[in-house]
Amino acid sequence: MNKSIDEIDFEKSGGLVPVIVQDANTKDILTLAYTNKESLELAKKTGNSWFWSRSRNKLWMKGEESGNTQKIKEILVDCDSDAIIYLVEPSGPACHTGEKVCFHNELK
């Protein structure tokens, strides 16, 4: 079933919804970020991963500084319309530390 951006429940969590970013080919989970309506519209329009930075309080495109962009192949919405998956083709590491994925620390 297809959903429109207007059907996403941004109000449930104060205007933001979590975005799981997954490699479309390897299925690796690359990161977890957040999107608001504006950044989701930009992602849909441009085909690049756009998010809302909670720490900087601004829109940002993955790779705008590092060059490690993510080309969106598909956007999936969960059954409650309050979480999203970007299936992407990354051009480099997902993590700002240089690691391939952000989930590289094991909880002890």
Describe each PLM feature range:
Residues N2-L16, Q22-L30, T35-K108:
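C-terminal binding/interaction regions
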